[in-house]
């Protein structure tokens, strides 16, 4: 999808949302942000890397000690960048020069997340039980 979520009547509040596995995440800031969260899913990541990742990122994966973790780290970087820009994912990932800053997070083992913004952001995680 293209575009960014917004709160009508409150343009000063920027936010982005994501969900995967047992987690839903929402990031708030005073500047535009993009955020993605992914649960590691063993079955699909290798095929997705072959299809979507640049040749350079595929080489990094082939040489990585923990390729699965690196895959989800790269994927969340790309997804959060596209969400920050409001363009979503498109074309071969990792082929364009990126502006801004990416901050990684992981709510628990088996999950990778990233927040992208024009300047470094501080991440504060809060678990809310149903």
Task: Indicate where each model-derived feature is located.
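Core catalytic alpha/beta fold that binds nucleotide/phospho-ligands
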Residues: 1-130
